Amino acid sequence: MPAFPSAIRGMIVGCGLLLAGCASGSDLWVEIGGARYAVEIADDDAERARGLMFRDDMPANHGMLFIHEREQPLAYWMKNTKIPLDILYFDDERLLVSQQRDVPPCTLGNGCPSYPSESPARYVLELNAGEAARLGLEDGAELHPAPAIPVP
């Protein structure tokens, strides 16, 4: 009889560990302008290429953080992106160097325009359109990533 309760105890511990692993997504956030956003990370070519394509919406206080290997001139476009976005470019020091606000969705495929950074950038944060204005973001604002996000 004592083996049964210990087996149940083992199952409960195992389920708890499994659920703890699922909660790790809540550790992925950034702060800017006094606001915190849960983010998805795009840190390889495939993830960066797909970005927020084909999404019908994005919850409030959510975004996507694109991490590039090095600081460089960057340009993003809205190909197959159904929601308007603010595109915020940050340098190696995670300082805001360029903003493209209220960028409209584009369904023109390869005919969609690109939205370049005004200075070299390494990190790009895409938020729902209007967030940069709501926060009153100005160039030089600092991006603060969660400790769980792999940035140097």
Please give the residue ranges for each predicted region.
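Compact, glycine-rich, soluble single-domain proteins
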Residues: 22-152
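General structural signal for secondary-structure boundaries
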Residues: 7-8, 44
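Bacterial N-terminal signal peptides
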Residues: 9-20
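N-terminal secretory signal peptides that target proteins for export/translocation
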Residues: 1-5
